[in-house]
């Protein structure tokens, strides 16, 4: 019998008519993850996750939700006392003034064989880490503490509602709190790539 070969995994982003993102996200057997991307929005924080499917027949829309084998709520490694999806990864990546990201992270719960055939998705906006609110500098502000005008702008920017919709404060807060524990309110999907075996 031949010797079993240990492989790493890689997701390769190729520019398309919809976005100019290119580069790789590489997953190693020891949990190391190398993110090397360009073509992102300069000086912007983008959410990044592993999604459950590698189905790109409908673009990034058919990649499913976050990879979540344990069936828990969305969270972050920054808050270890809270549950998190395995696919939440580092939640966010920060692009330089040239739209470039070069980051290294460690995700001990990401098993290479379990993510093959799934996808890495980059989102337009920032992941709120499942905290049901946002940070303004170092100060945390829950969605229930935001003004109605802030809430409307935040929700419309995430395509939850349209301008002119008659929505009250409670409806918006409930939607944002629900999505915070599901998607991190990360906004639309701007780029995706299937995770496959890496040659190296």
Language-model segments: residues:
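N-terminal leader/targeting pre-sequences
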Residues: 1-200
């Amino acid at each position: 019998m031949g010797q079993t070969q240990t492989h790493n995994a890689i997701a390769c982003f190729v520019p398309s008519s919809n976005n100019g993102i290119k580069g790789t996200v590489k997953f190693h057997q020891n949990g190391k993850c190398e993110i090397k991307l360009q073509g992102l929005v300069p000086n912007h924080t983008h959410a990044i996750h592993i999604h459950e499917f590698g189905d790109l027949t409908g673009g990034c829309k058919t990649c499913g939700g976050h990879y979540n084998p344990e069936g828990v709520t969305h969270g972050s490694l920054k808050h270890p006392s809270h549950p998190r999806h395995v696919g939440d990864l580092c939640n966010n990546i920060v692009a330089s003034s040239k739209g470039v990201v070069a980051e290294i992270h460690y995700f001990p719960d990401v098993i290479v064989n379990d993510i093959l055939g799934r996808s890495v998705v980059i989102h337009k906006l920032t992941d709120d880490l499942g905290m049901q609110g946002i940070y303004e500098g170092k100060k945390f502000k829950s969605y229930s503490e935001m003004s109605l005008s802030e809430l409307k702008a935040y929700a419309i920017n995430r395509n939850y509602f349209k301008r002119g919709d008659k929505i009250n404060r409670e409806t918006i807060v409930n939607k944002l709190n629900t999505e915070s524990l599901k998607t991190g309110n990360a906004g639309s999907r701007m780029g995706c790539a299937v995770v496959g075996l890496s040659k190296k």
